[in-house]
Each structure stands twice: as structure tokens, then as C-alpha cells.
Amino acid sequence: MPVQSRWVCSACGQTAAAVGPGGGSTPPRCRNPWCSSADRPLAAIFAVGTYEGAFRRAIVSYKYRRDLRWAPVFGRLLHGFLERHETWFEEFAVICPVPSFIGQGARRPWGHTELVCAEVGRLAGAEWPVESLVTKVAETEPMSAKARPARRAIARTGLAKAFTVPQPAAAEGRHILIVDDVCASGWTLLTVSRALRDAGAEEVAALVLARGVLGANRPSGSP
């Protein structure tokens, strides 16, 4: 009888099932197409948890209802993850929040990720300093509840032009850990990491509070 075993992608952390005699010895290709992309600018994505249940409700309350009580909680969660897995992040010299657009026409006139990272920086001190190396210069169309082709179109037009690195010298040669709240499709993280790599960063990885589960179904229009 075939034995089913589970594999974990070293790039995105998603699990995949391998079916074969004894479970097989060769890991299957990750379902996320970005993980096998030769020009992927993002080394890996680390996540504290998955975007479901009570954790998802807390993130939605913070991000969409501006329940600011969650900011220090999320900051402590991220810092605790960094401390528990310190050896994973020892090469990274700086934490960079994925920025929000807060100018005219912004969906949210406040930086939700920046606020969480401020708490991380307060707790981490000089070990993992927080620097805003990337700026978002324009609002972008939301990608939640969009099909993959629509997300790809948004990413290749508005998203790619929205993020800039004002001072490339600040990124040059550095190992940078970008931080965001949720990784769903990964397009935002990939776009920000590509901007940093184009500015001269040696390596970019990402840490998020929660990652979406590939294949998970959510009601249309849900965040």
C-alpha cells in the first residue's frame, strides 16, 4: 500500500503530501509556483502561525477595524519567534517593515505593520534594529479575494511601481528581514524583496504573523 508522508517546503513553509512506496525519498515540488522560480528574490518566508480561526479574527480586527490593542501583542509574538529561532536569523542585520501608503487616497491612513515593528524594535534593541528602508508611494488595489490571474496583473502593474527604496546605499550588501502581517499570495513580499535586491541587498527573507493556507476557501470579499 502506498504510504503518505508530509514534506515542508523550506522556502514558504507550506506542507505537501508525497505518495509512494514507503513515502518516497524525493520531496514533491511545492504547490506554490514561486518556490521553484529561478529568479525568486525572496530567500524564505517564516510565519508565526496560519491565517485562520482566532488568529485571523485578531489580525482582521487590528488591520481593518483599527483595534490598536493588538499592536503590542503582535510585536511580542514576532519578537518571541525571533528569539526562539535565533539561529535562523543570525545573519540578518536589520528588520524592515512592509510599508503602508498613508498619503491622499490611502485605504488606511496609518501604518499597521510599522506600528507592530516599532514594538519589535523596542524589545529587540540593537540585536534586530528596525529601519524603514522601503517606501510605498501610491495606493494599490487590494488583492484579497482576487483570483490568481487578477493578482498577477495587479502585481505587475500598480504593485511593482508602488514600492521604492529611497536610499539604496542603506540596503546595499545587507541581509534584510522584511516583516508583514499576512502572506496570502506572496506578491507583496516578492515585490518589496525585489525592490531591496535591486537596490543592492545581499539577501532578503520575510517574517509574517500568519500565512494563508494554499487552497483555503474564504468568502468573496473577505480580508
Regions found by a protein language model. Give the residues of each.
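Glycine-rich phosphate/pyrophosphate-handling loop used in enzymes and phosphotransfer proteins
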Residues: 1-223
